[in-house]
UniProtKB/Swiss-Prot annotation:
One Gene Ontology molecular-function label: DNA binding
Annotated stretches, region: Disordered: 235-255, 273-298
Tissue specificity: Heart, liver, lung, kidney and muscle.
Cross-link position per record: Glycyl lysine isopeptide (Lys-Gly) (interchain with G-Cter in SUMO2): 92, 165
Keyword Phosphoprotein part of the UniProt annotation: yes
Subcellular location: Nucleus
Origin species: Mus musculus
Subunit structure: Interacts with CTBP1.
Protein name, per record: ETS domain-containing protein Elk-3
Skewed-composition ranges (Low complexity): 278-287
GO process annotations (BP): angiogenesis; negative regulation of DNA-templated transcription; regulation of DNA-templated transcription; wound healing
Modified residues (Phosphoserine): 115, 398
SMART domains referenced in this protein's UniProt entry, alphabetically: ETS
Length: 409
């Protein structure tokens, strides 16, 4: 029953319903009725309006409102007896509301006399209405999330799409390739291959490279110590060690007084590794390095060279003021004359501390221990430092401090 129903409609529904004959009944055919159990009728009205404290006094005061509207009037001399003023016409005033109210009351009480076939037809109509509204809702695009019904209908739609895809290609038309999206991870090959020379060693493992570098450092210190001997006749004893590594390559032999030791650290890139070449002759390029274009001899600028006397050989050591320990000054060391050491400029690898490998040479040499005024004594600084710039090939010139020695042999 509708919640917006009025009191007179509620009483009329109770009168039309045969179930509530023990609560209210007709007393005549002209629309007169009597409340047999007025309190029970008031409680039903309170339940309809959600008022639990409803009683007959409140119900009777509500009925007085319809007195003025000429809908219901009180029968004088009879208790709980009322009458619809225009009884035959009262049913025609709102027949639709009355009929709906009556059907709802009958369904609620469970005493409706509808046949089972009618109930099945009614239920089938309701289910078809619900399914139609559900399909319209799903195809309208207004829903924002999946529901159970949509998930149940999804496989059929997918199957239909698949069958249509299989039936599309015909025998008359040539086969058309399906457009497929393929994700491929390809390395970037457009970058220019930067030729980086590496140290050519027999073994490519890191342990072999570390062993070769340690052997190289020990051979360098041995050669410098033999260079500092006063009666050193030959310094080109690196042929056994050079045969073990491709980077140590002996050249054609020279006279003993002109034999020299080259220490080359050619750095083409500040971050790349390059081989150190120890040879008994002129410097040679590694076969793995690409040939570099040379300028004509007329346009080639030779790097400045410095000749140190034999008394200043001891200043090559680690803590010498002429060459600081933290200096990364690139240089060639070549014994051109018996009494002098030839110093030329060349870029030294930043990651190799060449001066640290030469640190134990001067103190451990036999000539160094002969006396306090020997040839290999460190020079004392009396007249200050004399900076001599040694410009490298591709870096700013780095000065080498040369201090005059007061003790000459």
């Amino acid at each position: 029953m509708e919640s917006a129903i009025t009191l007179w409609q509620f009483l009329l529904h109770l009168l039309l319903d045969q179930k509530h004959e023990h609560l209210i009944c007709w007393t005549s055919n002209d629309g007169e009725f009597k409340l047999l159990k007025a309190e029970e009728v008031a409680k039903l009205w309170g339940l309809r309006k959600n008022k639990t404290n409803m009683n007959y006094d409140k119900l009777s005061r509500a009925l007085r409102y319809y007195y003025d509207k000429n809908i219901i009037k009180k029968v004088i001399g009879q208790k709980f007896v009322y009458k619809f003023v225009s009884f035959p016409d009262i049913l025609k005033m709102d027949p639709h509301a009355v009929e709906i109210s009556r059907e709802s009351l009958l369904l609620q009480d469970g005493d409706c006399k509808v046949s089972p076939e009618g109930r099945e037809v009614h239920r089938h109509g309701l289910s078809s209405l619900k399914s139609a509204s559900r399909n319209e809702y799903l195809h309208s695009g207004l829903y924002s999330s999946f529901t159970i019904n949509s998930l149940q209908n999804a496989p059929e739609a997918f199957k239909a799409i698949k069958t249509e895809k299989l039936e599309e290609p015909c025998d008359d038309s040539p086969p058309v390739e399906e457009v497929r999206t393929v994700i491929r991870f390809v390395t970037n090959k457009t970058d220019k291959h930067i030729t980086r020379p590496v140290v050519s060693l027999p073994s490519t493992s890191e342990t072999a490279a570390a062993a070769a570098s340690a052997f190289l450092a020990s051979s360098v210190s041995a050669k410098i110590s033999s260079l500092m001997l006063p009666n050193a006749a030959s310094i080109s004893s690196a042929s056994p060690s050079s045969s073990r590594s491709p980077s140590l390559s002996p050249d054609s032999p020279l006279p003993s007084e002109h034999r020299s030791l080259f220490l080359e650290a050619a750095c083409h890139d500040s971050d790349s590794l390059e081989p150190l070449n120890l040879s008994s002759g002129s410097k040679t390029k590694s076969p793995s390095l690409p040939p570099k274009g040379k300028k004509p001899k007329g346009l080639e600028i030779s790097a400045p060279q410095l000749l140190l006397s034999g008394t200043d050989i001891g200043s090559i050591a680690l803590n010498s003021p002429a060459l600081p320990s933290g200096s990364l000054t690139p240089a060639f060391f070549t014994a051109q004359t018996p009494s002098g050491l030839f110093l030329a400029s060349s870029p030294l690898l930043p990651s190799i501390h060449f001066w640290s490998s030469l640190s134990p040479v001067a103190p451990l040499s036999p000539a160094r221990l002969q006396g306090p005024n020997t040839l290999f004594q460190f020079p004392t600084l009396l007249n200050g430092h004399m900076p001599v710039p040694l410009p490298s090939l591709d870096r700013a010139p780095s000065p080498v401090l040369l201090s005059p020695s007061s003790q000459k042999s």
